[in-house]
Every structure is written in C-alpha cells, then in structure tokens.
C-alpha cells in the first residue's frame, strides 16, 4: 500500500504571497485598497484590517491552492497576514491621540534593547510581535457563499472558515482577555513575556533569564498588568433560525467568541450571518478528566452581517434617496404604504394604516425635569377568529428591523420582562432579557393576549407607559430599557363578540391596561354578501397564484418600506399653537360622548389625548413635515372612531336610524354647537368619516335635505348653509 505524498508548505513563500497581495491589490477605482487601510491603521483611525476572500479570489497573482489553504487553515494564515502587515506598515502621516501608557512602554522597551534581553537568545525575553501590534486581522468569507445552518457544521469543518446564519439569544458582558502576559524579575530586572493562546494559562513564577541562571538565583516574577496586553472579549450564543429546524427537533445553539473590534456588534434578538473559524475547545480541570478525548466547539468570529439594520443605522444610497423623494412627492403615499403591508390579506385598510403608524411612531420627549413621554404607539387588535390578526402580526414583525413575536400562553411574566440566571462563564448571577427587553427600540407582538394569566399581564403595565423593566431579584436591583411598541392580538371574552353584552364585558381587559393602548381595534366578522364574495375571490386568487391580485400599483417591498420609514423617523414634527385648542376641543368632545353613552365603547383618559398627538405626529412624519397639520389631527381622530366602527353600525341599527338621518343629525348638532348657520364641506366630511360614513353617503344626504329646503348647497365648494338651524 503506497503512502500518500504530503506536500510541505513553505510558510515564508506564503508570507511573500500575502505581502504581495496586500501591497498590489487595487480597488474598483484603481487605488491600492489595503495600503490605504494600513495607512489609516498607522494614523490610528481604525484598528481592524479585514481581508476579504472575494478580493483574494479576484487577485490575478493568487492561485486557487493558496485561496484554499487560507480557507482551510485560517487561524494560521491570520498570523501570516499579520506578519506581512508588520513588514508593510507605513509611517503615520497625521497626528493622532497618543495612548500614553502603551507608547511610553514601547519607547522604553526599544531604547533599552528589550528585543533580546541579556544576550538575545532567550525566547521568553524576545518581545512578541503581538505586543507591538495596534491592529487586528480578520479574514472575511466569500460574500456569495450560502451560509450553513448550525446543524450542517460538522467535525470536517474544524479549523476552516465557515459562514453560519442564526439568531443571537444571549450575550455576555465584554471582559478583558489576556493576550500577552508581561512579568518583571525582582533579581535581574528583565521583562519576561508569555503569549496566551487559550482561555486559561499557567502563570510563570521563576525567572527563566540567562542572568538568573548564571547567578543561580531564583528570581521572583511579578505580573505587570499595565504592561500586559489585553483584548476585548465577548461570548455569544447563536441559535438556529426556526425555518432551519427539522420537524420534531429543538433548535441547536453554538458558542461564538467575539474579540476586539467585533465586540458589542450584536444584541439578543438580532438575526445575523457570521463568518468565523470553527475550532475545538478542550475541557479543563475535573471536566477534562471526565470528558476524556471529547472537546467542545466554538466559532471564533471574523465578520458579522445583520439581516435587518436598525432604523438609525440606515445609510440611504443615492438611488434609494431618489426613490424616497419620488414617493414623498406622491399625494397618495399614505394609502400606498398602508396597502403595501400584507397585500395578500383582503381589506383592513384602516387597520393597515394604524399598523403603518405603529412602525413610524413619534419621537420620545424628555422634559426639563427629566420626565419622559413615550413616542411608541401601542395597538391591540381584538376580533372574531379568522380575521387575519395573527397574520398581520407576523407580517409587521417581518417588516420591522427589530421585532419579537410571542404568544400569551407561551409567555410567563419573567419570559416577557427579565429573568435572573447564572452565567456559565463567570458563575455570577446575570439578568437575561425577556421578549420586551429583546424588542427594545423595536416592536413586540403578543398573540393570544387574552389567554395570558392576569399576573403575567400586569408585568406589561410598566413597559407600556414608563418603557422600563424594574427588577429586584437575587441581589440585583436595576431597571432595563424596554422602549418597545406593543402590538397585541386578542379574542373577545367568549371567543366571538357577543352583541347582547356590553363592550366592556366583551373586551374583558382591565381599564389600567386598556387605557395604555393608543388604539384598540375591534374587528368583527359580519355576514355581507358583497364583501364575502370579494374576499372569497381574493383568497382563491392568492391560493392559486401565490400572490395578491393587482392593487392598481406595485406594492412596495419590505426593504423599500424600511428605507422610507427610517427616513421618516428622522423628522421631529412639532404641534403648532393654533392647533392646541382644536385638539383640546376634540378630546373634550370624546369625553362628553362617552359620558352620555350607557355602555361606552372605550375607556377614555388623558392618555387618549397623548395618543391623538402621537398618531398626528406619526402622520406628519410620513409627509416629511416639520409641523403637524389639522388634517393629521382629523385623520388621527378618524382612526380612533373607525376602530369602533362595527359597534357604531350596530348601535345605529338598534336605534333605527338610517345613514342619511344620522348624517343629518351630526351636521345639525355641529351647527348648533358652533352657533353658526354654515358648515364647510371639508369639515362635514371629516365629521361623518369619524362615524364610519363615506363621502357618497354625505352627498346623498346633502341632495335629499336640499330638496326639502333644510339647507342650501354652494354649487362649487359644496359648503352647507342652514336655512333654519
């Protein structure tokens, strides 16, 4: 049996190849890409040098074998590229902030000839290259390679550069990791260096220098922490995405080590794509005795790519900015954006508008005395089964850059807020954020809200108004940020809405929680011949063609929606003084209507006034306007009325009023309230829209009562003048 020939690798030649690539690779404009990066490193502008395999692939002088060796033995080649960078590192061309301790120590070491100590032969006295370097080398995987799932990473990938996708479930604190330990001998005074390549190491106690050996002295070594080199270190748990888990299995997770500039780049709940080196991690101590030859594995991260950027991280490119400018000039953009949300779901136009405003939100306000007023909108969708509440929730989480979806029965109080757990690395008690904390600066969707235990539901009260989670457990007393918009879906108390009972009995939520929702949307499933026929056609079309029917325009894709919303969220509109009285009057009229009603449809408090302001500001943001217009306030009031539209229609049926008579009553009451004989058409349309009537019904009412000489209609503006108010 012939022995297989093994090819010896000349690492000096490999370093020459790496040096040639770094020195000669040109960017898209012909500029020396990596030499420019090294100049920024020398000027202390950046620390990370990221070498992309895509560039190595396109470099004319790099062969495929070299590329394969870099991919399969990445840890070794990081050192080779670092040595090549040491040789190519240019002198600094700009003044930079001096790191006093480090620079003084380095200057002193060079002046004293620390490179070699007493006779230059002792390896422990030679200054390691790591302690000289003020840069970090990362090798980024191919951009077009399909990422593996955690389940697909096998033992054959050990030592290789792999790309993995998953969701971050846990992040440890950032801690210092020793890279080079520096000791000083009490006898000879020399510096002794010890490179640390693992998580644990055995410190040196006796001086190994030649002078101490010649003097037969056992010099005592003192660890110099200020002179040693530390690296930022963070441990992260990456879990399989739900769509990658086979049937009947639980998601697997992988430990990821982040070092240096890659720390603090992810947070729990982020869906990311990581490229890194898959490495074994041997057990230590008693665990090693029991484990035998078995080792744990981890991923040493080289690059991190977020699937969905946060709104504030969006940097609009030229073509995206032009597209947003074109959309902003469209007079019907509000309707188009709303209809682009879940176009496969039939109808629910006003619900989609409310959900669009939830995504946009209003800016948080902080008063001079430190009090905060939230800007996030909270919406509860309550309705009969089968009206697509859960599908709307899932779609909003898909569109939002940061979103967490959970269900009422599957969530406990600590699962929503925060739990105290023991850190496996440090054995300390640490806080682990729940769904509401994970959704900080995003959206938390809670399905089956009515099925939650009352004790668990009360945990949400503080989050919805103060937007913090206060904890006092296991000796930890703190507050966590939970600046999240809550989107809840619930069924009425008896499964379906019972018209024989009052709204309060059907809704079955405590007033303390009810008042915290900006909009409580009641969606009732009523039999209607025309609507049911249209819906059935729509559902059959979606089922057959896997897409929504034509909407009259091309729906905007989620990335475009995110870009538009991120641009809108940068606007901070203000409410002009002339609208203050108008908003106050509208709020007081809502309170009066509720006081007159025997069974009020909602629970109106001063929070309702803040809700009107938040919705109005979100509408102004969509128009990229710096000030709130009256039309924004009118639309906010209309959405509040339309959320209870199905109940108003039943009230009208019970009272025996038809649409025409009810519209006449609304206009007559308005004329009496303002003590005026005239009502503008635009104002009349706004009034009846709030009650759920259409413009066609208003025109029919105007014509009918004009023929009875109750009022006169202006031929051009359609303004109303009462003949006898």
UniProtKB/Swiss-Prot annotation:
Record CDD domains? MCM7
Keyword annotations for this protein?
A: ATP-binding, Cell cycle, DNA replication, DNA-binding, Helicase, Hydrolase, Nucleotide-binding, Nucleus
Q: Which reaction does it catalyse?
A: ATP + H2O = ADP + phosphate + H(+)
Q: Where in the cell is it found?
A: Nucleus
Q: Recorded GO terms, molecular function? A: ATP binding; ATP hydrolysis activity; single-stranded DNA binding; single-stranded DNA helicase activity
Q: What class of enzyme is it?
A: hydrolase
Q: Where is this motif: Arginine finger?
A: 515-518
Q: For this UniProt entry, what's an example GO CC term?
A: cytoplasm
Tell me which Gene Ontology terms the entry assigns under biological process.
DNA replication initiation; DNA strand elongation involved in DNA replication; double-strand break repair via break-induced replication; pollen development; regulation of DNA-templated DNA replication
Q: What is its EC number?
A: 3.6.4.12
Q: Which residues form the MCM domain?
A: 333-538
Covalent S-S links between cysteines: none
Top-rank taxon of the source lineage equals Eukaryota
Q: Summarize where ATP binds, as residue positions.
A: 383-390
Quaternary structure (record): Component of the minichromosome maintenance (MCM) complex, a heterotetramer composed of MCM2, MCM3, MCM4, MCM5, MCM6 and MCM7.
Instruction: Give the protein's biological function.
Output: Probable component of the MCM2-7 complex (MCM complex) that may function as a DNA helicase and which is essential to undergo a single round of replication initiation and elongation per cell cycle in eukaryotic cells.
> What protein family does this chain belong to?
Belongs to the MCM family.
| Entry protein name | DNA replication licensing factor MCM7
Give the organism the record lists: Oryza sativa subsp. indica
């Amino acid at each position: 049996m012939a022995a297989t020939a093994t090819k010896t690798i000349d690492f000096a030649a490999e370093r020459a190849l790496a040096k040639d690539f770094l020195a000669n690779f040109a960017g898209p404009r012909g500029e020396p890409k990596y030499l420019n990066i090294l100049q920024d490193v020398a000027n202390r502008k950046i620390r990370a040098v990221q070498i992309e395999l895509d560039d190595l692939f396109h470099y004319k002088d790099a062969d495929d074998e070299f590329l394969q060796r870099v991919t399969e033995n990445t840890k070794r080649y990081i050192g080779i590229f670092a040595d090549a960078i040491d040789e190519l590192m240019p002198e600094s061309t700009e003044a930079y902030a001096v790191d006093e301790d480090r620079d003084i120590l380095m200057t002193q070491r060079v002046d004293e000839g620390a490179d070699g100590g007493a006779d230059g032969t002792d390896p422990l006295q030679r200054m390691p290259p790591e302690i000289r370097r003020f840069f970090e080398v990362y090798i980024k995987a191919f951009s077009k390679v399909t990422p593996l799932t955690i389940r697909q990473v096998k033992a054959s990938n050990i030592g290789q550069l792999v790309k993995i996708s998953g969701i971050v479930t846990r992040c440890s604190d950032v801690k210092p990791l020793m890279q080079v330990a520096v000791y000083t001998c009490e006898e000879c005074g020399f510096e002794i260096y010890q490179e640390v390549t693992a998580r644990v190491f055995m410190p040196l106690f006796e001086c190994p220098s030649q002078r101490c050996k010649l003097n037969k002295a056992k010099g005592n070594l003192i660890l110099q922490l200020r002179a040693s080199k530390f690296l930022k270190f963070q441990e992260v748990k990456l879990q399989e995405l739900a769509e990658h888990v086979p049937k009947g299995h639980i998601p697997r997770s992988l430990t990821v080590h982040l070092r240096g500039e890659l720390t603090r780049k992810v947070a729990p709940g982020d869906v990311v794509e990581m490229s890194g080196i898959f490495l074994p991690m041997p057990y230590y101590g008693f665990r090693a005795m029991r484990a035998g030859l078995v080792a744990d594995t981890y991923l040493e991260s080289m690059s991190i790519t977020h699937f969905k950027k946060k709104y504030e991280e969006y940097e609009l490119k030229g073509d995206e900015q032009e597209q947003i400018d074109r959309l902003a000039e469209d007079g019907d953009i509000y309707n188009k954006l709303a209809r682009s949300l879940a176009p496969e779901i039939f109808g629910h136009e006003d619900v989609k508008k409310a959900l669009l405003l939830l995504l946009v939100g209003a800016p948080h306000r902080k008063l001079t005395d430190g009090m905060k007023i939230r800007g996030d909108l909270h919406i509860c969708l309550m309705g009969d089964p089968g009206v697509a509440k859960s599908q709307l929730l899932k779609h909003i989480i898909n569109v939002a850059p940061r979103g967490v979806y959970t269900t009422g029965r599957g969530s406990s109080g600590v699962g929503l807020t925060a739990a105290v757990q023991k850190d496996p690395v440090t054995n300390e008690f640490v806080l682990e954020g729940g769904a509401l904390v994970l959704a900080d600066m995003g959206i938390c969707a809670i399905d089956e809200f009515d099925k939650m235990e009352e004790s668990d539901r009360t945990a949400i009260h503080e989050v919805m108004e103060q937007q913090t989670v206060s904890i006092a457990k296991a000796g930890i007393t703190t507050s966590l940020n939970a600046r999240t918009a809550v989107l809840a879906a619930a069924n009425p108390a008896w499964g379906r809405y019972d018209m024989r009972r009052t709204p309060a009995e059907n809704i079955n939520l405590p007033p303390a929680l009810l008042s915290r929702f900006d909009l409580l949307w009641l969606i009732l499933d009523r039999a209607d011949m025309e609507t049911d026929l249209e819906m059935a056609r729509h559902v059959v079309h979606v089922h057959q063609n896997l897409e929504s029917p034509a909407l009259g325009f091309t729906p905007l894709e989620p990335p475009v929606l995110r870009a538009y919303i991120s641009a809108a969220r940068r606007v901070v509109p203000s409410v002009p003084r002339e609208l203050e009285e108008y908003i106050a009057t509208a709020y007081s009229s809502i309170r009066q209507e509720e006081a007159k009603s025997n069974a009020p449809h909602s629970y109106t408090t001063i929070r309702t006034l803040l809700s009107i302001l938040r919705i109005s500001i979100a509408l102004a943001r969509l128009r990229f306007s710096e000030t709130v217009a009256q039309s924004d306030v009118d639309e906010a009031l209309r959405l509040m009325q339309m959320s209870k539209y199905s109940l108003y229609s039943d009230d009208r049926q019970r009272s025996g009023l038809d649409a025409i008579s009810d519209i006449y009553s609304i206009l007559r009451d308005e004329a009496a309230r303002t003590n005026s004989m005239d009502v503008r058409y635009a104002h009349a349309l706004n009034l009846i829209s709030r009650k759920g009537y259409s413009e066609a019904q208003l025109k029919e009412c105007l014509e009918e009562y004009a023929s009875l000489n109750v009022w006169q209609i202006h031929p051009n503006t359609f303004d109303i003048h009462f003949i006898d108010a």
